[in-house]
Amino acid sequence: MTDHSSDKTALVLFSGGQDSATCLAWALARFARVETIGFDYGQRHLIELECRARLLDGFRAISDDWAAKLGDNHTLTIPTLAEISDTALTRDVAIAMGADGLPNTFVPGRNLIFLNFAAALAYRRGITDIVGGMCETDYSGYPDCRNDTIQALQTALSLGMARDITLHTPLMWRDKAATWQLAQDLGGDALVDLIREDSHTCYLGERGARHDWGYGCGECPACRLRSKGWIEYASGI
């Protein structure tokens, strides 16, 4: 479960969702110490931030090694992002596909802003490794999730901070089924069950409906991707 090859600290973008929880486990297997950062940007699914605390408690319960490695959990509030965005994640509007081929859940610049804030915090704390759950395999087409975007931002951050920043994206080329499998490989059934029960993906913040893959409305793009991945993972496809 654990690789002690690194004596460094990593900062994980940890929203409380499936992908970021899996990335947290990935980081705990590779770094000597791991801190987490989450963002309150006025999202409709603010419930995800409440899930973070339960997930962190769950990680500590799964492994004493993980418990020892987990460091500070940071939460930053960025209200301006909702003020300048007109999307289904920050407004009470129906989720729909836009004329540009992107769903209206796309929050322009969100990951760019998150990674800039994460890098600024990491700089203050002497951290040069940042881990995020961006992926361009099973995703909604968001341009700020693409590998070329992340690589360009890594270069910009390294230049702007005058130190070598590494942006790790362990899910970039994994589909959702492979993401479930990665959780299994890293933490066994205990981690898979924790992610099913206590992570949150649904864009609408629905926690009343329980499915095999966890909680959610079952209809939004995030729920559909998570459900499809679970079915493929569980059936061994």
From Swiss-Prot:
Binding site residues for ATP: 14-24
EC number: 6.3.4.20
Keyword Ligase: yes
Entry annotated with the keyword NAD: no
A biological process from GO: queuosine biosynthetic process
Requisite cofactors: Zn(2+)
Organism domain of life: Bacteria
Residues that coordinate or bind Zn(2+): 202, 217, 220, 223
Name under which the protein is recorded: 7-cyano-7-deazaguanine synthase
Upper lineage: Bacteria, Pseudomonadati, Pseudomonadota, Alphaproteobacteria, Hyphomicrobiales
Gene name tied to this protein: queC
